[in-house]
Amino acid sequence: MTATLIDGNALSKTLRAQAAERAAALAARGHRPGLAVILVGDNPASEVYVRNKIKACEDNGFFSLKDRYPATLSEPELLARIDELNRDPKIHGILVQLPLPAHIDSHKVIEAIAPEKDVDGFHVANAGALLTGKPLFRPCTPYGVMKMFEAYKIPLQGANAVVIGRSNIVGKPMALLLLEAGATVTICHSKTCELAAHTRAADIVVAAVGKRNVLTADMVKPGATVIDVGMNRNDEGKLCGDVDFAGVSQVAGHITPVPGGVGPMTITMLLVNTIEAAERAAAAA
């Protein structure tokens, strides 16, 4: 068996075109969607992520604002800038690129963002609302994975799903979205005993731990859907995920590649969340 490839690039292109149409409709009414991205320090990976987010905005008719600060920026200065953006009617979404320098409390920074502009979905108000099934925003990466399941008609109701990873950014919200969709969900992590015993029984496996080859072919049920959220580098310096793609793709029914899988969807869902924020603001105006 050779798995069907879940093409994040192609799906992302379709969804971005839809987002661009919605953005144009809002702009015609005087409510062009606006996203502010804040980068503190000079982390090379963060610089790439921010550049890609700004480009996605520009390519799809969004207003974008990039604030770049040195790593010496103080926490009070950052909080003051977020307060300004919270009050700026041109800005509908605020994103602070993580990680932040060690002297800045990322939790305090995230909580400073107005919940209605928290397009990452990390604010405690949105995280709590996700638990009730009625969030303002779904975190972008898990939201993108759910769109992949929808596009490729992967049945979730009654499915056994394993999420490897328990981060607030991917693992926990991914489990909640799968649960809401009717799956029976198991969360595995670094302390899990017999990881393979869980994954072999799963119809769906989402790997999100940032560790190469955490999932190999012998750990996968034939025909299962495997979603690789990991972003790592192999010994040659090439981008790879958490899944042994060469082996698992011969066993799984569906699989996402790295690159070209979940990555493009994360930025796309950031656009979707920003559109939704702008539409709410326009409706309230």
Swiss-Prot record:
Subunit structure: Homodimer.
One cellular component (GO) term of this entry: cytosol
Residues the entry annotates as binding NADP(+): 165-167, 190
Listed NCBIfam families: PRK10792.1, PRK14186.1, PRK14189.1
Native organism: Burkholderia mallei (strain ATCC 23344)
Gene Ontology annotations of biological process type: L-histidine biosynthetic process; methionine biosynthetic process; purine nucleotide biosynthetic process; tetrahydrofolate interconversion
Superkingdom of source: Bacteria
Family the entry assigns: Belongs to the tetrahydrofolate dehydrogenase/cyclohydrolase family.
UniProtKB keywords: Amino-acid biosynthesis, Histidine biosynthesis, Hydrolase, Methionine biosynthesis, Multifunctional enzyme, NADP, One-carbon metabolism, Oxidoreductase, Purine biosynthesis
Alphabetized GO MF terms: methenyltetrahydrofolate cyclohydrolase activity; methylenetetrahydrofolate dehydrogenase (NADP+) activity
Annotated function: Catalyzes the oxidation of 5,10-methylenetetrahydrofolate to 5,10-methenyltetrahydrofolate and then the hydrolysis of 5,10-methenyltetrahydrofolate to 10-formyltetrahydrofolate.
EC number: 1.5.1.5, 3.5.4.9
Cited CDD domains: NAD_bind_m-THF_DH_Cyclohyd
Catalytic activity: (6R)-5,10-methylene-5,6,7,8-tetrahydrofolate + NADP(+) = (6R)-5,10-methenyltetrahydrofolate + NADPH; (6R)-5,10-methenyltetrahydrofolate + H2O = (6R)-10-formyltetrahydrofolate + H(+)
Name of one Pfam family that matches: THF_DHG_CYH
Pathway(s) it belongs to: One-carbon metabolism; tetrahydrofolate interconversion
Record's protein name: Bifunctional protein FolD
